[in-house]
Amino acid sequence: MRIALGIQYDGAAFCGWQSQPHGKTVQDALERALAEFAQTSLHTTVAGRTDTGVHGLGQVVHFDTDLDRADFSWVRGTNAFLPSTVAVQWAKPMPDTFHARFAAFERTYYYALYVHPVRSPMLAARAGWVHTPLDVDAMREAAEHLVGEHDFSAFRSSECQAKSPVKHLYQIGIRPDGDFIHFRFRANAFLHHMVRNLMGCLVAVGRGRYPASWLAEVLESRDRGCAAPTFMPEGLYLAHVGYPAEFAVPPAQLGSVPWSSVWADLDGRP
């Protein structure tokens, strides 16, 4: 039997998603909890591995098991053994054709950026921060150069293991909201550090260091050295993983963050 789980977690509490010998990752915490509840080892496959500091609102995993438990039993039973910084939101039996990673056709990330002369301790692990105003119109113009199917080599980490740097970036939405600017990135898939590298470049344009057309030059160069430094992880949220309707994957619960209404308005999609 294949079971899918919807997971939320505070990325600041973990050293990324992928299991490590030190055991301080989200995958390690989840698999320990599953083992306690199921009384057997269960290996999880994830939709998208996130880095240290990156949060998960709509993460999806699957595992195979011979155990027959009610859906909500998996939720409550696993959560009983998880730390407060990670929680299973839903559980659902799936056909063998479902795969958390390979069945997904799109991913959506949001970035919450606090723009203020003084940093906020209350937002230290929840939002990125810049101390100077940003030109939103310039960033929007720059983002237009990135939308579409491109070779995103200039925005991939040197540690990226993706077979191809070609991805289809469907949308970049940018919306100011008081002292915040919110960003929405939706694509069929993302390279390692791709969203944070895009953020670094957009912020550089917003600060006036480069014109909006610079993003087209960086993209065309396919050279990571031509782009801005990787932006901080704290404001980044994996919010949604899209699957074919036949799997009826439950939607992510974005209401757990204070900016959910702003995010929903970026283009009218969850």
From Swiss-Prot:
<dbReference type="GO" id="GO:0031119">
    <property type="term" value="P:tRNA pseudouridine synthesis"/>
</dbReference>
<comment type="subunit">
    <text>Homodimer.</text>
</comment>
<feature type="binding site">
    <location>
        <position position="109"/>
    </location>
    <ligand>
        <name>substrate</name>
    </ligand>
</feature>
<dbReference type="InterPro" id="IPR020097">
    <property type="entry name" value="PsdUridine_synth_TruA_a/b_dom"/>
</dbReference>
<feature type="active site" description="Nucleophile">
    <location>
        <position position="51"/>
    </location>
</feature>
<comment type="function">
    <text>Formation of pseudouridine at positions 38, 39 and 40 in the anticodon stem and loop of transfer RNAs.</text>
</comment>
<protein>
    <recommendedName>
        <fullName>tRNA pseudouridine synthase A</fullName>
        <ecNumber>5.4.99.12</ecNumber>
    </recommendedName>
</protein>
<dbReference type="Pfam" id="PF01416">
    <property type="entry name" value="PseudoU_synth_1"/>
</dbReference>
<comment type="similarity">
    <text>Belongs to the tRNA pseudouridine synthase TruA family.</text>
</comment>
<dbReference type="GO" id="GO:0160147">
    <property type="term" value="F:tRNA pseudouridine(38-40) synthase activity"/>
</dbReference>
<dbReference type="GO" id="GO:0003723">
    <property type="term" value="F:RNA binding"/>
</dbReference>
<dbReference type="InterPro" id="IPR020094">
    <property type="entry name" value="TruA/RsuA/RluB/E/F_N"/>
</dbReference>
<dbReference type="InterPro" id="IPR020103">
    <property type="entry name" value="PsdUridine_synth_cat_dom_sf"/>
</dbReference>
<keyword id="KW-0413">Isomerase</keyword>
<keyword id="KW-0819">tRNA processing</keyword>
<dbReference type="InterPro" id="IPR001406">
    <property type="entry name" value="PsdUridine_synth_TruA"/>
</dbReference>
<dbReference type="InterPro" id="IPR020095">
    <property type="entry name" value="PsdUridine_synth_TruA_C"/>
</dbReference>
